[in-house]
Amino acid sequence: MLPLAKNALSRLQVRSIQQVVARQSHQKKTPTFHDKYGNAVLAGGSIFCISAWTYTATQIGIEWNLSPVGRVTPKEWRDQ
């Protein structure tokens, strides 16, 4: 009789959980901060970050040394 009672109780608990979930899914959900402002905050942060790095890379005078083309001249060969 014990396994039968345990099975019946577990089914009752599962049904009650399913009913609670069904009730919650039908209620109106109020938007959270992330729902309201998430994309705007992400876009604003991205724009700020890109502009700060652009300023840093172009205006503060860092010598990047990206390519030696035009700056390096070959030496003349010596005949031995």
UniProtKB/Swiss-Prot annotation:
The keyword Disulfide bond does not apply. Residues 1-24 form a transit peptide. GO terms for cellular component: mitochondrial inner membrane; mitochondrial membrane; mitochondrion; respiratory chain complex IV. Pfam families: COX7B. The chain crosses the membrane at residues 33-59. Residues 25-32 are mitochondrial matrix. Component of the cytochrome c oxidase (complex IV, CIV), a multisubunit enzyme composed of 14 subunits. The complex is composed of a catalytic core of 3 subunits MT-CO1, MT-CO2 and MT-CO3, encoded in the mitochondrial DNA, and 11 supernumerary subunits COX4I, COX5A, COX5B, COX6A, COX6B, COX6C, COX7A, COX7B, COX7C, COX8 and NDUFA4, which are encoded in the nuclear genome. This is Cytochrome c oxidase subunit 7B, mitochondrial.
